[in-house]
């Protein structure tokens, strides 16, 4: 279940209407997950500085169990999100980092009481954080 958080210093009136739905669909396609399992939050109008500058920028944080993988996969995911969001938000190429982090299965709660989370070896203590500038 991927969680995407898009933070931007763009005012709300510069964020295209329906972006959260389009980002959800794009994330499902890029990450290979069903859209009904993707969660998106868009936060416009934030006080942000990127590389010391307050020029328009955005940051996408993606966390998921089993989606964030190899460096090659993460570069590919980042490139696809970069392409999608720079067009949607009309941002410069140097104004949009993507942060990918794996969420250990132990960090996710069961969907209903008593449910056991299936899967192979738990990735406890194997959390990874990747930041890419494409």
UniProtKB/Swiss-Prot annotation:
Q: Provide the E.C. number(s) assigned to this enzyme.
A: 4.1.1.-
What InterPro entries does its record include?
A: Macrophage_inhib_fac, Macrophage_inhib_fac_CS, Tautomerase/MIF_sf
The answer to whether keyword Lyase applies is: yes
Which Pfam family, an example, fits this chain?
A: MIF
**What EC class is this?**
lyase
**Its job:** May have lyase activity.
- Name of the protein described by the UniProt record: D-dopachrome decarboxylase-like protein
Whether Cytoplasm counts among this entry's keywords is yes
Q: Which PANTHER family match?
A: D-DOPACHROME DECARBOXYLASE, D-DOPACHROME DECARBOXYLASE-LIKE PROTEIN
> Which keywords appear in this protein's UniProt record, sorted alphabetically?
Cytoplasm, Lyase
Question: Which family, according to the similarity comment?
Answer: Belongs to the MIF family.
Species, as recorded: Homo sapiens
State any GO CC term. cytoplasm
Q: Where in the cell is it found?
A: Cytoplasm
MF-aspect GO terms: lyase activity; phenylpyruvate tautomerase activity
- The principal location of this protein is cytoplasm
